[in-house]
Amino acid sequence: METIKYLIIDTETTGLDASKHEMLAFGAVVVVDGRIVETLELKIKPARIENADKKALEVNGYTERAWRDAVTKRDAAEILKYFLITHRDATSVGHNLQFDIKFIKAFSAEQNVELRVPWPYIDTRDLCRAVLAPFGLQSMSLDSICEFLGWKRKNAHTALSDCEDCAKLIINLCPPSPRFLLRLKAMQLLRNMGSLL
């Protein structure tokens, strides 16, 4: 039987525009045959923090103190290069993955280091839209999806924690296990009964 390998990635950034904002953190979880086998979390020292969107820093929990042990951009580029090459045989997974890929490409160009996110890609937003929306999920934010599934989020909006939540999604939804689908059906019935009362 062929091994199924996923590389779940997430970035935290100083804003939404990859041409002027920076990657503050990179997280990854490697899943092989439904089991988490490796994780990576890098905090990266920003060079242009004055260009940061204050709201983005607030969401990501950025403070100088929290990032005091962060790696330099150069070191981060070398670590990422090795990590992505090591896992080039995986299918890349992320929540709004194109956003993360844009920042990784900008970081790659800035550091003059080739960083290739393995292809093919699976976006968990699209996966949840296909599998969970029929059961009543309306918002495709990771917070809303986890709440819908009754999953408590720890350290939301940190790169590694978001990857861990996406790993749970990919393990349960790709393909959906019969047990998980039965649980969704039960949740849908309970919601429907609640709206009748």
Regions found by a protein language model. Name each.
Residues 147-148, 160, 164-197:
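Acidic two-metal-ion nuclease catalytic site recognized across multiple nuclease folds
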Residues 13-15, 126, 165:
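Short, glycine/acidic-enriched loop or turn micro-motifs at the edges of active sites
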Residues 135-145:
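A structural motif
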Residues 16-18, 129, 168:
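Conserved protein kinase catalytic core
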Residues 98-120:
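Substrate-recognition/cap helix-loop segment adjacent to the acidic, metal-dependent catalytic center
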Residues 101, 124, 160-163:
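Conserved glycosyltransferase catalytic-site signature
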Residues 121-137:
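Short alpha-helix plus adjacent loop in nuclease-associated cores
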Residues 1-7, 12-105, 144-151, 157, ...:
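Conserved non-catalytic scaffold segment of RNase H-like nuclease domains
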